[in-house]
Design a protein with these regions (language model features):
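Generic structural signal for well-ordered alpha-helices
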Residues: 38, 61, 65, 100-101, ...
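Active-site cleft segment of glycoside hydrolase catalytic domains centered on the general acid/base Glu
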Residues: 90-93, 122-145
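Conserved small/polar residues in nucleotide/adenosyl-binding loops
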Residues: 149-155
Length: 157
């Protein structure tokens, strides 16, 4: 499998297994089919699994957890996401912590490689997005359940 550099982070397979299909976003499949799909993808050289709690209401993350039972192959990277939506700025850090904890539990992992805050974080409040949300993600990197974080921020007009 051809590899490519993921930004300044690591080399990963040119193909990524996204969680939409195994989260049953496009139609019903069995858990067994989804687990087999993830395992086969990794066997064939896919090294990046892109998950999110919104892919099947946590099902995609649960499938990865079932596929590897906490024993992810060393060369496989996992990303997941969290959506803050209109969270009160005073509750952002707790919202991120609890969302990440739930994802890790479903994935049966102690850490993920890349954690995205998925969406415009607080579209009407740019300052909260930049000055509250970014610092609230730093604990995850320092405490090591996440290797890297990435924010999708609204642009300030």
């Amino acid at each position: 499998m051809e590899t490519r550099q993921l930004g300044g982070l690591w080399p990963v397979s040119a193909l990524t297994l996204g969680g939409g299909g195994i989260g049953q976003l496009w139609g019903e499949t069995t858990r067994e089919e989804c687990v087999a799909t993830v395992q086969k993808a990794v066997d064939l050289g896919i090294t990046l699994l892109d998950m999110a709690p919104s892919y099947g209401n946590g099902e995609a993350e649960s499938v990865v957890g079932a596929a590897f039972k906490g024993n992810l192959p060393a060369n496989v990277r996992v990303t997941t996401k969290h959506r803050l939506g209109e969270t009160n700025p005073k509750k952002i850090e707790q919202n991120i912590r609890s969302g990440l904890a739930e994802s890790l539990k479903r994935l049966r992992l102690e850490r993920v490689d890349l954690f995205f805050l998925h969406s415009n974080i607080i579209p009407h409040d740019f300052d909260a997005s930049v000055y509250v949300t970014r610092p609230a993600t730093r604990w995850a990197v320092y405490k090591e359940p996440v290797s890297y974080t990435h924010l999708t921020l609204p642009t300030k007009a």
